[in-house]
């Protein structure tokens, strides 16, 4: 089957490159595009509730990145996110000890 379209939305998330590899041509003169998706891992951690309010907090870490603390599931706080380039199999993604330490250090500056 052959299809023609003015635009194609590749909504495959971290598998976008694999889906793109299955296409034969594109609108750039009949050849495959050479750009690759850049995968970035944004991890979160859930910890025992850090505050009593129903409000979310936005914190700025020493590296100027923004970290949020959101009430989660009643008894927890959701803390995130990290921003780490990722070059492995998306099916094998998991938070690293360094990311956990980063998020804990950021929150420790504001909550005791």
Summary of predicted features, one role per range:
Residues 6, 10-26, 31-112:
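Active-site substrate-recognition segment that forms the wall
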Residues 1-2:
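A structured beta-alpha segment of the ubiquitous adenosine-cofactor-binding alpha/beta core
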């Amino acid at each position: 089957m052959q299809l023609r379209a003015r635009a194609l939305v590749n909504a495959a998330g971290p598998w976008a490159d694999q889906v793109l590899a299955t296409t034969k041509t594109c609108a750039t003169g009949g050849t495959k595009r050479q750009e690759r998706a850049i995968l970035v891992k944004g991890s979160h951690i859930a910890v025992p509730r850090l505050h009593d309010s129903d409000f979310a907090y936005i914190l700025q870490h020493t590296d100027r990145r923004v970290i949020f603390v959101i009430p989660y599931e009643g008894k927890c706080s959701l803390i995130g996110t990290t921003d780490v380039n990722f070059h492995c199999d998306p099916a094998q993604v998991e938070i690293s000890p360094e990311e956990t330490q980063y998020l804990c250090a950021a929150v420790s500056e504001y909550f005791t």
